[in-house]
């Protein structure tokens, strides 16, 4: 049964896969930081190469954000692809078992029926997930068009990565707000001053009335 795409706010499916060097990578390894997980159909094809190179060129700008590619290709295929285009981020091999389907691609809903020249077949639909530090999907791009995609993902990743710092910057404001009541005594002092001035006027008026009565007598 084909799994559906993962919606925003939903926990991303856990995975454990080897990268181009044979190192095992798991979703849990990226906990605590944003993760760009992009699925692509095949190594060293035109659109897939353009997409990989675009992420590679922008990689230094993904500060605090991990970028990982996944396709059904083998570790050996990934190694050649990464070496040819000098890709320094992980490419995970979701190689399907004989007669089976790629497990992680299926879990993320990107293993779908496709059509080319009137023929239908199963394959990876180009999809990108932005996963938050808590492991939930923050954003998803479906049926990705390569041109400008890496830049769009970078902008969204920066916004997500800045979320924690924005929260921490808001805390001092809340603390300073707690000191706001200190202004109240000043207002009270002014009110007291008004009362005193009013009472002094009343006293003066009463003295004037007394003097007038005395003069009449």
Label the model's feature ranges.
Residues 1-217:
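Chalcogenol-based redox active-site neighborhoods
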């Amino acid at each position: 049964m084909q799994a559906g795409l993962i919606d925003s706010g939903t926990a991303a499916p856990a995975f454990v896969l080897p990268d181009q060097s044979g190192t095992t990578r798991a979703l849990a390894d990226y906990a605590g930081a944003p993760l760009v997980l992009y699925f692509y159909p095949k190594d060293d094809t035109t659109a897939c190469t353009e997409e990989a190179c675009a992420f590679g060129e922008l990689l230094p700008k993904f500060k605090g954000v991990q970028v990982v590619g996944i396709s059904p290709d083998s570790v050996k295929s990934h190694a050649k692809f990464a070496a040819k285009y000098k890709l320094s981020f992980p490419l995970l091999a979701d190689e399907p078992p004989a007669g089976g389907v790629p497990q992680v691609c299926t879990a993320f809903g990107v293993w779908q029926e496709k059509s080319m020249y009137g023929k239908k077949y199963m394959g990876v639909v180009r999809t990108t997930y932005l996963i938050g530090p808590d492991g939930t999907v923050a954003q998803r791009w479906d049926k990705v068009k390569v041109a400008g995609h890496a830049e769009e993902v970078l902008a969204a990743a920066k916004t997500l990565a800045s979320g924690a710092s924005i929260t921490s910057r808001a805390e001092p404001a809340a603390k300073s707000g707690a000191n706001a009541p200190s202004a109240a005594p000043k207002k009270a002092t002014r009110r007291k001053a008004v009362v005193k001035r009013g009472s002094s006027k009343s006293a003066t008026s009463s003295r004037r009335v007394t003097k007038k009565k005395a003069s009449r007598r």
